[in-house]
């Protein structure tokens, strides 16, 4: 997502999920449920907040671009029949003569 920009994996996943969700940001969670020793299930997947951070039409256009990476770009090998896959091209910072 840019040179010299440090983000965690969960931050990156959250950003891309906002694109997939039409511009809505949802707090990420990792644990869906906990099963107690007595088989009682404790759910942890409640959406704690959801807010719109970008226009849905803009997100639709970004999704189209990310989709093209898979359908006709460098990510064609990632295509999975029956699934709508989107991807981002690789970003590299090239050094020439040590710079």
Predicted regions: what they are:
Residues 10:
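Active-site-adjacent helix/loop patches that line small-molecule binding or acyl-intermediate pockets
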Residues 83-99:
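Short, Gly/Ser/Thr-enriched beta-strand-loop segments that form substrate-interacting elements
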